[in-house]
């Protein structure tokens, strides 16, 4: 019997969970565009950095940016809308992972730079994407065993590391953008500070709707002021083409070489930890239970998007932590807002003029908004860690030492360039890579594999709450996750009386593919 993803209100009527609510079109457009603006700087910086390092021409660089935006849109729609058992059906934006930047540059320079280097990179990206996609289809028991590597102490640490590592990215934008001739000029900090203050005032004093679009309004207001003062340049809009279509294998047929493939597989292992943490974090923010099948669907979307990225001249994809911070700030939980953002990104990828308008937002303005969002990402990680018993010395050591490792590349970069070869340095010279690896290894040393209920055992609570109806129709494309009250502690009892667990009846949560208990959101 088909199960409806719904929750019961106090009068017994079914109501749609906020995640599955389709907002009116004007709100969808506004909220979706806000996600695009929040995501844009982080999205385009990877092709810019990689393309510049490989000495691509300006025209080739523009093509990379448009291809990235186009693929980001498709990937985000797959993740948020869902296709059968692919996609988490949560408000998760997909973007190119920063973790892959150094390895891709190393691969590209090793291949001689230019478009020939892109072909080697794309071969590795396609292979790693297919491998990730295949991994996420492991049998439920095997997949749950792997997911036990990521209890809250690991996912919370990784999300916190992401926020801490990303904050300097926002601050560099606030200073005018790395490499700009006037980097560090006071006017950039003035734009950043003014934008940040505008956002904070709206969040504090604005009505709920204004608060929910505070980032968008802050970016618009900051850009308007910069334009009036002559610091927002829209000249490139007129020079850009109206239409720019992304075609598969634009630069040629990919080349598949073993070492770049191995390097990219390691990168995807780290992005899997990122996506797992982001999935649990956004599930916690929106009040939607996350189990092992939800994580598997999110990782399948990652793998599919990464393989598609290699075909469409882009790079590896991950659930973007920046937009998790935005969901937390705005409290807009609908996944269809992300679908709308995906449509906007596809349009931007097809319309270079539209992309040029967004690109005209000054660095200082972007930096002010980005710093707020990245700080919220770190806070989401800290919130997850709040559900971990940090009074236990072993957990405190896992978090503290992992954070210390994550800061190593930023504080002592010479260690990697001076004492490691280029290939190893490109892999380890990343705060996210070191922090995530340290968290996983230290957790295994101190805690071993987590129990199946390490993320709160919502499935056990669902059984106690009653009536689990399984929807086993494959490829239905509907969200089969019903809503149960959130666990109030990280380790909920495996079974409690229904009367004590929930005074009001609620639809139980059953997994489409696996009726057995599995990990859930912290």
Each model region followed by its residue ranges:
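Hydrophobic transmembrane alpha-helices of multi-pass solute/ion transporters
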Residues: 12-14, 18-22, 30, 198-201, ...
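Hydrophobic, membrane-embedded alpha-helices of multi-pass small-molecule transporters
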Residues: 26-39, 43, 184-196, 213-214, ...
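Juxtamembrane interface elements at the cytosolic ends of transmembrane helices
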Residues: 5-13, 43-47, 51, 194-205, ...
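N-terminal signal-anchor module of multipass membrane proteins
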Residues: 2-92, 99-114
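Short, non-helical or kinked segments that cap or interrupt transmembrane helices
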Residues: 63, 85-100, 146-154, 210-217, ...
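Membrane-embedded alpha-helical modules
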Residues: 109-232, 340-456
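Membrane-embedded helical hairpins/re-entrant loop segments and their flanking transmembrane helices
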Residues: 25, 51-89, 263-335
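Terminal cytosolic tails of multi-pass membrane transporters
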Residues: 431, 435-501, 505-522
């Amino acid at each position: 019997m088909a199960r409806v993803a719904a929750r019961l209100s106090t009068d017994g009527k079914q109501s749609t969970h906020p995640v599955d609510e389709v907002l009116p079109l004007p709100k969808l457009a506004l909220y979706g565009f806000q996600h695009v603006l929040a995501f844009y700087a982080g999205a385009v910086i990877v092709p810019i950095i990689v393309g510049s390092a490989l000495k691509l021409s300006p025209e080739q660089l523009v093509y990379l940016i448009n291809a990235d935006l186009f693929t980001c849109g498709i990937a985000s729609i797959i993740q948020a809308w869902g296709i059968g058992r692919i996609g988490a059906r949560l408000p998760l934006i997909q973007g190119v992972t920063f973790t892959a930047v150094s390895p891709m540059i190393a691969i590209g320079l090793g291949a001689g730079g230019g478009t020939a280097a892109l072909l080697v990179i794309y071969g590795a990206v396609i292979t790693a994407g297919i491998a990730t996609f295949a991994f996420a289809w492991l049998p439920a028991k095997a997949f749950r065993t792997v997911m036990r590597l990521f209890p809250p102490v690991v996912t919370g640490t990784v999300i916190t590391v992401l926020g801490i590592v990303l904050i300097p990215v926002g601050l560099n934008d606030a200073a005018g953008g790395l490499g700009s001739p006037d980097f560090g000029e006071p006017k950039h900090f003035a734009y950043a500070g003014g934008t940040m203050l505008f956002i904070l005032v709206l969040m504090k004093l604005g009505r709920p709707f204004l608060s929910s679009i505070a980032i968008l309004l802050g970016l618009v207001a900051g850009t308007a002021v910069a334009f009036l003062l002559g610091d927002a340049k829209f000249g490139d809009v007129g020079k850009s083409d109206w239409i720019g279509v992304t075609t598969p294998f634009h630069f040629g047929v990919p080349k598949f070489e073993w070492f770049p493939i191995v390097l990219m597989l390691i990168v995807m292992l780290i992005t899997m930890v990122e996506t797992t943490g982001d999935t649990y974090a956004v599930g916690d923010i929106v009040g939607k239970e996350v189990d092992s099948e939800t994580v598997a669907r999110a990782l399948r979307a990652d793998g599919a998007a990464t393989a598609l990225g290699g075909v469409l001249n882009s790079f590896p994809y991950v659930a973007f932590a920046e937009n998790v911070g935005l969901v937390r700030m705005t409290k807009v939980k609908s996944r269809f807002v992300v679908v709308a953002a995906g449509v906007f990104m596809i349009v931007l990828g097809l319309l270079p003029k539209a992309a040029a308008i967004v690109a005209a937002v000054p660095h200082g303005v972007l930096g002010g908004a980005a710093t707020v969002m990245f700080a919220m990402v770190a806070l989401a990680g800290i919130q997850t860690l709040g559900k971990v018993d940090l009074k236990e010395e072993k957990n405190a050591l896992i978090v503290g030492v992992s954070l210390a490792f994550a800061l190593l590349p930023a504080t002592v970069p010479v260690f990697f360039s001076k004492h490691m070869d280029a290939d190893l340095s490109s892999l380890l010279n990343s705060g996210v890579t070191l922090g995530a690896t340290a968290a996983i290894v230290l957790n295994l040393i101190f805690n071993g594999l987590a129990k199946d209920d390490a993320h709160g055992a919502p499935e056990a609570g669902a059984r106690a709450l009653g009536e689990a109806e399984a929807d086993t129709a494959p490829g239905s494309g509907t969200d089969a996750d019903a809503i149960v009250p959130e666990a109030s502690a990280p380790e909920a009892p495996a079974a409690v009386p229904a009367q004590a667990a929930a005074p009001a009846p609620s639809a139980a949560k059953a997994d489409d593919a696996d009726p057995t208990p599995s990990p859930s959101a912290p």
